[in-house]
Structure formats: structure tokens, C-alpha cells
Amino acid sequence: MSTLCPPPSPAVAKTEIALSGKSPLLAATFAYWDNILGPRVRHIWAPKTEQVLLSDGEITFLANHTLNGEILRNAESGAIDVKFFVLSEKGVIIVSLIFDGNWNGDRSTYGLSIILPQTELSFYLPLHRVCVDRLTHIIRKGRIWMHKERQENVQKIILEGTERMEDQGQSIIPMLTGEVIPVMELLSSMKSHSVPEEIDIADTVLNDDDIGDSCHEGFLLNAISSHLQTCGCSVVVGSSAEKVNKIVRTLCLFLTPAERKCSRLCEAESSFKYESGLFVQGLLKDSTGSFVLPFRQVMYAPYPTTHIDVDVNTVKQMPPCHEHIYNQRRYMRSELTAFWRATSEEDMAQDTIIYTDESFTPDLNIFQDVLHRDTLVKAFLDQVFQLKPGLSLRSTFLAQFLLVLHRKALTLIKYIEDDTQKGKKPFKSLRNLKIDLDLTAEGDLNIIMALAEKIKPGLHSFIFGRPFYTSVQERDVLMTF
């Protein structure tokens, strides 16, 4: 997929990446601060195109710009600073993650950056969190790689001289290449297949004459309900691109315009890979009719996910937010620990680093049936299909329904703030909250809690006392009220 080009002057190595579609990304760079020469670029990654949009010299100049002034950086150990540059005179935007690390025996400041045209600003902003999360984890692994290289080869460096030291430092580039390529592929796929801000209800299941015309009534109810219970994050799989995309558009009706731009339709010709961080994404099964979700990427998603199979009409969901985040952090620590303990580059490959920490044995059956029924979505579906299709009535009714959910979420947040004096006291009674806010159905509570979690992150963990309650323990707690 990638070819290594001869290093351009002034000796900056470059890797060109062959992408299937048009890439909005101009380049990605890895730079460092040299105490004598100032900011220097170590490596450039750029999409392989017929027309060169930025010369290597221009990319080097822009990448150097991200480290200017960092000589006085005084950050905590392990800190990663995210910086966003808009250079109107150059017509580009640069997202740069600045961090400290040990490479070639010296502690210095580094910058991992992506460069896009300024015209892609509106395209990129909804994806900013996804990209930053990806780049942040690349840096975590990169720090370990740099430290291991320095630690394991310090004796060889002393014996073989400084030239050997430079060779050892270069070994981080293949690891970075393997991590940067998926980020470029993600942006390329989003450029061609992202869901538009405005969705015509005529392209969704909600435009059917009657409920059940396109899919089974119970399946549609479970899909929308679980989608809302998992903070609007769903993956839709199937054998027909048309059928998958229709469900994707339907679920995206319940998202904000910005969240829709962070969602992706499936490709008819070939299936995309699952990407953590997207809200809704459609994926095609292979020729055998099977599809495997990568455990690592699913665990790294910021919110729990709903899995919807349109071929067999099944809906599965992950545990609630607080449990998902707890498991995510444990898995991340486990992966980095295994990465640290690896004794060879083959052992450090991404596919072989799988929960080897003895203290963490993840449940591979992370998707479970939708256990909690709701009245909110059921009442909405019963009423919306009584309206005449083909007009704007259903769109207006949907907007009213979403407004009601949002108001309920804000009311729930305010209720908890008043009851706890904005977190100064523990929350007293979940039972009273459910009665006072008319959320006695567990599904209704889960939907409003999920929406409130997006407005005020950490609410789940605060309500249930400790962030590591499992779903079973959580239900036991609810039964005591």
C-alpha cells in the first residue's frame, strides 16, 4: 500500500500512501526539536496523487511551524498538547499533537501533525475528536517504542557509535506508518461516503406507508431504542448496501447535524473497515455472509455501540457508558503493558497485542440483547406512522420528539445538580428521580441518561456511585430502591 521514496533535500524521508479514493489530507508529519538546528522534520506521509498539492519543502516548512516556540514548553510528564493552526496565508489547517519523549538517548519535544487544505475545515471539524483520539493513542505507543529502543540498544550504541544510534531511532517510523495509514484511509472514506447534514426522510424507513413495510416492527423499535440507549452510536451490517444505508439514514435522523457528518454510509462495491469514534456506520458482510467486528477498535470507541444486522433482524448492544469506559481504560492499560513487555518487533505488532495482562480478562461477548424496553420510542413509532407519508408532517413530528428527549435530558441533569448541590453530595434516590421525571421504564431511563451523558460526560459514573459496576450489579442496585 505504501512505497518509500528517496529522501528529498534536506534529507527528509517520505512515504507515499496509495488510497482508494480522494484524500482530503495533504500530509502527515513527524517532527522533533533539535537543540542546535531547531525544529526538524523526521518523516512525511502523503497520499499518492498525480498532482502534487504541496511540495516536500512546503510540508517541511509547515511542520516546522508547529514546533516553533516549544523550546520553552513546560508541561507535565506524559502530557500531550493538542494545537490547531489555521494558516490563511498558506491556505492550510494543521492539527498537531505536541509531546515529550526519549529518542536516540536524548529527551526532546516532538510533534505528530496532519495537514489539510483550509477549504476542508468544515469537513474536518466534526471529525476532530476522532482524529485526536487516534493520534493520541499512536503517541502512547510511540513513547513506549522510543523508550524500549533506547533502553534495549544503549550498550550497542556505546559500542558501535552515533551512526548506529541514528539507525535505531529510525525503527519507530514503520510503527508510525502502520498507525498513520488507517487515519488517512478513514478521512478518505469519510470524504466520499459521510452522511450529509440534511437527510430526506423519504430515504428512510420512516417514510413507509405503514410500520413494518421495510422491516419488522419489533426490529425497528429495538434498533432505534438501542441506538438512543448507546448515545447514538451504532454499526449496521448486512449483505445489501441499499438496505444497510436505509437503516443508517434512519438512525442518523436521531442525531445532530454535526454527528451525522461523523457517520458513514457503506460502500456498495467493497466493505469499509470498522472505525472507532464514528456515530453510525454501515458495513457489508463478506462473500460468505459473515462479518467480524475487531474487538480492539470496538473497545476504543468513546461510547458503547449498538450492533444491528439487517439480514437476520437482530439488535445487540454494549453495556452502558460507565461500564464501557471502565473496560476501555483497563483494556488500554493492558495493551500498552503488553506492548511494553514485548521482546521483538513481531510481538509488538498491533494484531498480536491482545489483553495479556493477567489482571484483566475481558468478556469477548461484549454485545448483549436489548434487555430494557421503553415507552418513548414505541409511542413515537405508533404515532408517526399514523401521519400521512410524503409530506413534511413526519419530519416535524420527529423534530418535536427529539426536542422532548433533549428537554428531558436537561431536566434530568438539573434534577441531579439540585439534589447533589452540583456534585458536593452523593445522589440520594434513583427511585425518586424515575418517578418525578416519569422515567419508570428502564428503557426510557437509559435513553435519557445516554443523551444526558453526551451533554454532561461522567453522569453515569456519578449516578451509580462507582464507575466499575457491571450491568448485573447495576440492575441489583436499581432493585434496592
From Swiss-Prot:
This protein's UniProt keywords: Amyotrophic lateral sclerosis, Autophagy, Cell projection, Cytoplasm, Cytoplasmic vesicle, Endosome, Guanine-nucleotide releasing factor, Lysosome, Membrane, Neurodegeneration, Nucleus, Secreted, Synapse
Boundaries of every uDENN C9ORF72-type domain copy: 23-194
Biological-process GO terms, alphabetical: autophagosome-lysosome fusion; autophagy; axon extension; endocytosis; late endosome to lysosome transport; negative regulation of exocytosis; negative regulation of immune response; negative regulation of protein phosphorylation
Location of the cDENN C9ORF72-type domain: 200-343
Function: Acts as a guanine-nucleotide releasing factor (GEF) for Rab GTPases by promoting the conversion of inactive RAB-GDP to the active form RAB-GTP. Acts as a GEF for RAB39A which enables HOPS-mediated autophagosome-lysosome membrane tethering and fusion in mammalian autophagy. Component of the C9orf72-SMCR8 complex where both subunits display GEF activity and that regulates autophagy. As part of the C9orf72-SMCR8-WDR41 (CSW) complex, functions as GEF for RAB8A and RAB39B, thereby promoting autophagosome maturation.
Organism annotation: Homo sapiens
Transmembrane segments: none
Start and end residues of each stretch annotated as Required for the homodimerization of the C9orf72-SMCR8 complex: 461-481
GO molecular function: GTPase activator activity; guanyl-nucleotide exchange factor activity; small GTPase binding
GO cellular component, one term: cytoplasmic stress granule
Name of the gene encoding the protein in the UniProt record: C9orf72
Disorder: Frontotemporal dementia and/or amyotrophic lateral sclerosis 1: An autosomal dominant neurodegenerative disorder characterized by adult onset of frontotemporal dementia and/or amyotrophic lateral sclerosis in an affected individual. There is high intrafamilial variation. Frontotemporal dementia is characterized by frontal and temporal lobe atrophy associated with neuronal loss, gliosis, and dementia. Patients exhibit progressive changes in social, behavioral, and/or language function.
Protein name: Guanine nucleotide exchange factor C9orf72
Localisation per UniProt entry: Cytoplasm; Nucleus; Cytoplasm, P-body; Cytoplasm, Stress granule
Expression by tissue: Both isoforms are widely expressed, including kidney, lung, liver, heart, testis and several brain regions, such as cerebellum. Also expressed in the frontal cortex and in lymphoblasts (at protein level).
Short name of any one Pfam family annotated for the protein: C9orf72-like
Coiled-coil segments on the chain, per record: none
Subunit structure: Component of the C9orf72-SMCR8 complex, at least composed of C9orf72, SMCR8 and WDR41. The complex is formed of two protomers, each individually consisting of one molecule each of C9orf72, SMCR8 and WDR41. The protomers homodimerize via an interaction between C9orf72 (via C-terminus) and SMCR8 (via N-terminus). Within each protomer SMCR8 (via DENN domain) acts as a bridging protein between WDR41 (via C-terminus and N-terminus) and C9orf72 (via C-terminus). The C9orf72-SMCR8 complex associates with the ULK1/ATG1 kinase complex.
Residue intervals of the dDENN C9ORF72-type domain: 370-464
Primary location recorded for the protein, binned into one broad class: cytoplasm
